[in-house]
């Protein structure tokens, strides 16, 4: 069983402040999510942990981008997986910023940690190859809703790389049956990343957080943009908060003397 305390990725004091897509609702970043500009703004605020999603182009280049297609936030159209890197490279987010490759982000922010949601099966092997070739095993935590994808990533990269649980593994961890909770804890994950609530269901109950901690798992909660929720979760003892409102989370943590980021 891989526990968070064993991995260099988690070498920061908890709670980890994690910039979702670079801080998509931070005023300078609005309309420029997942750009090098947005990530630089998060780093300037003192963030060390940056969240992004990845897709791979037709020729295997890994891009930091949320959607499967370019249509919503760029001046181009088409599915990334069906386009070559030369085509993806011409797209501009918000009409101005290029879509960064994951390799470019690794190089641009050498002190940052990256929480990476691998969005499609076609991006699994290119992402694993990139982590190996850049020797960034200690700087990434890989995530996916898909258990199949996250298991493939664990097989390709081994236990030295942090991973979160897939959805089915989280369901097992929430089971009232101890056997299934223990089974989930042995999946190879080092953290669990969940929403605070799904509809009327509260996911991050005190019992759930305590059970995750009992198995050595960190609990990170997404995507938390309301200050009262941030305060509630910090009181609950979660280990990380993923937010679009990076300035608000920073202020909350500073007020509680829990901000451990670089000066910004």
Predicted segments — roles?
Residues 1-264:
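Phosphate-group recognition and catalysis centered on beta-loop-alpha active-site segments
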């Amino acid at each position: 069983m891989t526990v968070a305390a064993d991995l260099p990725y988690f070498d920061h004091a908890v709670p980890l402040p994690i910039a979702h897509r670079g801080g998509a609702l931070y005023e300078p970043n609005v309309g420029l999510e997942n750009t090098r500009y947005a990530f630089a703004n998060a780093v300037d605020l003192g963030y060390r942990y940056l969240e992004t999603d990845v897709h791979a182009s037709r020729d295997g280049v890994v891009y930091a981008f949320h959607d499967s297609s370019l249509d919503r936030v760029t001046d181009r159209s088409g599915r990334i997986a069906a386009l070559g890197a030369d085509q993806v490279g011409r797209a501009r987010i918000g009409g101005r910023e290029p879509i960064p490759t994951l390799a470019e982000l690794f190089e641009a922010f050498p002190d940052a940690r990256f929480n990476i949601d691998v969005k499609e099966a076609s991006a699994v092997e290119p992402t694993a190859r990139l982590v190996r070739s850049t020797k960034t095993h200690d700087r990434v935590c890989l995530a996916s809703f898909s258990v199949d994808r996250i298991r493939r990533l664990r097989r390709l990269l081994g236990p030295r790389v942090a991973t979160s649980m897939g959805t089915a593994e989280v369901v097992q961890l929430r089971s009232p049956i101890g056997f299934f909770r223990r089974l989930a804890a042995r999946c190879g994950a080092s953290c669990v990343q969940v929403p605070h609530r799904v509809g009327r269901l509260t996911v991050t109950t005190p019992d759930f957080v305590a059970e995750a901690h009992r198995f050595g798992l960190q609990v990170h909660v997404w995507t938390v943009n309301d200050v009262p929720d941030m305060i509630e979760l910090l009181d609950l003892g979660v280990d990380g908060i993923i937010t679009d409102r990076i300035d608000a989370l920073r202020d909350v943590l500073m007020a509680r003397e829990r901000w451990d980021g670089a000066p910004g």
